[in-house]
């Protein structure tokens, strides 16, 4: 097929929506030096910048400028030999295995004499002239590379005209649409964060078999789907399998980075799609962090977006997550406010899964304001004696915690992502707010602070509390994010883990991040 842009040059300008852009690539053209074999008719495909018609050209600075298509091994064309709507495939070409040509020769085992012939291209290794297949799975092996689009649905039409040398010359008009994604993040993620997959969902079919004629792509055929899955270098076994794409399975070279500004030369994602207007179009970026094991999907939606045949649409998206956890929020219990756990030793704050242990940098005695409050709580009937007096005064008290446990209707959300210390994490619970619980019970929030089911547990030793522990309701509904309409009733608490001792008795003087992504306190 004709290959789209091997290297797209992207403007440093950030584009908020779809913009028609294109780009001229400079690559040494491989010249065809073969003679026209006897008893064969030669069709010569030209792809020069002056005659190219498969893209829209612009000269505005800082915008993509032009498209360049290539012919690769496996490409073939069809011609309407007898002008009766019956197309025949070429019998040979000068495209060698591994070749990438701007111009190519196709040979037909016949002496053809008409002034012109209709030409169709329906993809690499195609089997029909009246049908094109848009691949449900598309794999890209380098940033901003489109060397495989012939396998994924690239197609085109032309009219080949006989020249003075007796050869038929044509320039293909491309009829597929090319969506070029360029995600970035002004947050400034660590280099271990990147994109490994993109899932595209539309309001009408975008993959499978489509009718094809001289006007281009037609209606979807039976079995066509509304989804396309794009992967970088290696295919995921399924959406949920992105959870295994962590440092144990994936080298950082096998993901596309998230620069701080849009730059397709670093991470251009090219997806071949049927042209048309899509009432709803959803793009989900599959993100991973090879340092922390964090993962999840970032969703972007569009309404009434049009993809034009033969043109690329560049979409640049600033990926911003709505939850950020401050790494300086780790405290020993009721330590002095602003005297967080690793204060004064920021190089020790290595947060994530499988992080090394630290033997120094944390408080070891009450003389250090970062040390925990050693006054035992919950041991007397005096509420004041059991109360936090320093940094933990803003924490939920015993009664409030019980209301959250018993009436918060907690829902575990594996896919909720958050950021901390420039890294990506996922996992946490949604739990109803005290305000919502009070509203449902027709009481005040203040009354929830003062007692639980008629008893003030701030003055009750924890050993006598029958409600101190509750098993999580393992129903499927509690592993789903609250419906969007109900989300304001909940608060999200990230499973940010905690710093504790390793399990070995010989390591009791060490501190290590435990249960990050699994537990939170």
What would you call each of these model-derived segments?
Residues 216, 323-521:
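Conserved positions within compact, well-structured domain cores
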Residues 2-12, 16-406:
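Sec-type signal peptide cleavage vicinity
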């Amino acid at each position: 097929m004709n290959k789209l842009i091997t290297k797209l040059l992207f403007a440093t300008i950030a584009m908020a929506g779809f913009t028609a852009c294109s780009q001229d690539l400079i690559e040494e053209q491989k010249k065809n030096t073969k003679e026209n074999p006897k008893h064969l008719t030669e069709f010569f495909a030209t792809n020069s910048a002056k005659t190219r018609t498969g893209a829209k050209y612009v000269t505005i600075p800082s915008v993509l400028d032009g498209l360049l298509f290539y012919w690769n091994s496996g490409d073939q064309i069809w011609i309407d030999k007898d002008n009766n709507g019956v197309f025949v495939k070429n019998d040979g070409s000068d495209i060698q295995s591994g070749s990438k040509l701007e111009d190519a020769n196709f040979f037909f085992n016949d002496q053809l004499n008409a002034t012109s012939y209709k030409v169709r291209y329906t993809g690499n290794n195609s089997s029909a002239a009246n049908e094109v297949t848009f691949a449900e799975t598309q794999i890209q092996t380098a940033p901003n590379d489109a060397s495989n689009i012939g396998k994924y649905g690239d197609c085109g039409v032309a009219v080949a005209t006989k020249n003075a040398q007796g050869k038929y010359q044509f320039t293909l008009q491309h009829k597929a649409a090319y969506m070029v994604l360029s995600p970035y993040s002004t947050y400034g993620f660590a280099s271990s964060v990147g994109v490994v997959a993109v899932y595209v969902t539309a309001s009408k079919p975008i993959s499978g078999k489509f009718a094809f004629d001289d006007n281009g792509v037609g209606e979807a055929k039976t079995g066509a789907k509304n989804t396309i899955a794009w992967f970088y270098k290696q295919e995921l076994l399924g959406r949920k399998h992105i959870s295994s794409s962590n440092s144990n399975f994936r080298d950082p070279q096998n993901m596309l980075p998230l620069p701080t500004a849009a730059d397709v030369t670093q991470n251009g994602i090219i997806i071949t799609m049927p042209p048309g207007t899509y009432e709803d179009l959803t793009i989900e970026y599959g993100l991973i962090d090879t340092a922390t094991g964090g993962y999840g999907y970032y969703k972007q939606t569009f309404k009434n977006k049009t993809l034009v045949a033969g043109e690329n649409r560049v979409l640049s998206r600033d990926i911003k997550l709505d939850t950020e956890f401050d790494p300086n929020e780790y405290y020993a219990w009721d330590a002095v406010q602003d005297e967080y756990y690793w204060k004064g030793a920021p190089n020790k704050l290595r947060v994530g899964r499988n992080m090394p242990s630290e033997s120094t940098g944390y408080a070891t005695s009450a003389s250090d304001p970062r040390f925990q409050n050693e006054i035992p709580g919950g041991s007397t009937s005096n509420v004041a004696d059991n109360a936090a007096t320093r940094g933990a005064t803003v924490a939920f008290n015993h009664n409030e915690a019980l209301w959250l446990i018993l009436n918060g209707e907690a829902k575990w959300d594996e896919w909720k992502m958050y950021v901390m210390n420039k890294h990506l994490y996922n996992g946490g619970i949604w739990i109803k707010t005290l305000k919502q619980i009070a509203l449902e019970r027709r009481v005040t929030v203040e009354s929830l602070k003062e007692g639980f089911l008629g008893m003030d547990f701030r003055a009750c030793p924890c050993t006598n509390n029958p409600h101190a522990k509750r098993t999580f309701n393992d129903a499927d509904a509690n592993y789903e994010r609250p419906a969007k309409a109900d989300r304001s009733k909940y608060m999200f608490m990230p499973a940010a883990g905690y710093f504790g001792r390793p399990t070995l008795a010989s390591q009791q003087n060490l501190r290590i991040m435990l249960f990050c992504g699994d537990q939170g306190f």
